């Protein structure tokens, strides 16, 4: 069965633009693909382990080919369990609000924890290979200001560390088919409402054939 993993990146459950657009995407996707499974991963209700001394020691033991100690093995098992839903899914939907020109720290924590050699990528001395190859992703990017608007005082070329980071990371772990939908000006009343409506329509269109 085809499985979609929805990673919800906003803690604002009542008025989140990224969640609203993601929900529209998922509603349309369910209608178009009633036999597919959708799994939700709310990072704000997810126990993400600290990448602490034991985890770091396990990482370097693995890189050097040394056997793991019991504490290192336990730490590494938690990392592998956290990454398991990404291996089990065929498609990904990310809802990503922009925080301080980048992504929420909880999402960065998750990515930092699971982006490990032999977990999400391999390295043979000649180069890297992502272990999520063949999968596809749609990413909803929500922003309070108009980064793409002409004359913006936060132009995307200088201030957008959100979309480039997500796309670089996804491709690094093997996901080459990446679609982005941007909803901006969420702090601007009527203008923000118009942009939400446009993003929702775009999400529904993409979801039908995703």
Swiss-Prot record:
Claim: Oxidoreductase is one of the keywords in the record: yes
Pfam families given in the database record? Flavodoxin_2
Entry EC no(s): 1.6.5.-, 1.7.1.17
Give the top-rank taxon of the lineage listed in the UniProt record for this protein.
Answer: Bacteria
- Which reactions fall under this protein's catalytic activity? 2 a quinone + NADH + H(+) = 2 a 1,4-benzosemiquinone + NAD(+); N,N-dimethyl-1,4-phenylenediamine + anthranilate + 2 NAD(+) = 2-(4-dimethylaminophenyl)diazenylbenzoate + 2 NADH + 2 H(+)
What SUPFAM superfamilies would the database entry show? Answer: Flavoproteins (SSF52218)
Do the record's keywords include Oxidoreductase? yes
* Gene3D superfamilies given in the database record: 3.40.50.360
Q: Which cofactor does it need?
A: FMN
List of residues binding FMN:
10, 16-18
Q: Keywords on this record?
A: Flavoprotein, FMN, NAD, Oxidoreductase
Which enzyme type, at the first EC level?
oxidoreductase
* Molecular function per GO: electron transfer activity; FMN binding; oxidoreductase activity, acting on NAD(P)H as acceptor; oxidoreductase activity, acting on NAD(P)H, quinone or similar compound as acceptor
Cross-referenced InterPro entries: Flavodoxin_fold, Flavoprotein-like_sf, FMN-dep_NADH:Q_OxRdtase_AzoR1, NADH:quinone_OxRdtase_FMN_depd
Free-text remark on how the cofactor is bound:
Binds 1 FMN per subunit.
Q: How does it assemble?
A: Homodimer.
What does this protein's UniProt record list under function? Quinone reductase that provides resistance to thiol-specific stress caused by electrophilic quinones.
Cited HAMAP family:
Azoreductase_type1
Family listed: Belongs to the azoreductase type 1 family.
Instruction: State the protein's name.
Output: FMN-dependent NADH:quinone oxidoreductase 9
Name its species.
Answer: Burkholderia lata (strain ATCC 17760 / DSM 23089 / LMG 22485 / NCIMB 9086 / R18194 / 383)
């Amino acid at each position: 069965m085809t499985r979609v993993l929805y990673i919800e990146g906003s803690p604002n459950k009542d008025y989140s633009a990224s969640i609203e657009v993601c929900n529209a995407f998922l509603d349309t996707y369910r209608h178009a693909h009633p036999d597919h499974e959708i799994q939700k991963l709310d990072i704000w209700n997810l126990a993400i382990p600290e990448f602490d001394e034991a985890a770091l020691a396990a990482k370097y033991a693995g890189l050097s080919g040394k056997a793991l100690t019991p504490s290192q093995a336990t730490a590494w098992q938690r990392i592998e369990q956290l990454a398991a839903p990404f291996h089990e899914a065929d498609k990904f939907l990310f809802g990503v609000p922009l925080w301080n020109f980048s992504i929420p720290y909880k999402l960065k924590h998750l990515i930092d924890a699971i982006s490990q050699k032999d977990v999400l990528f391999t390295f043979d001395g000649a180069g890297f290979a992502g272990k999520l190859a063949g999968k596809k992703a749609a990413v909803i990017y929500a922003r309070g200001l108009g980064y793409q608007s002409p004359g913006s005082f936060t132009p995307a070329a200088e201030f957008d560390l959100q979309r480039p980071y997500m796309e670089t990371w996804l491709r690094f772990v093997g996901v080459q088919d990446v679609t982005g939908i941007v909803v901006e000006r969420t702090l601007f009343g009527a203008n923000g409402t118009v942009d939400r409506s446009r993003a929702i329509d775009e999400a529904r269109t993409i979801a039908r054939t995703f």
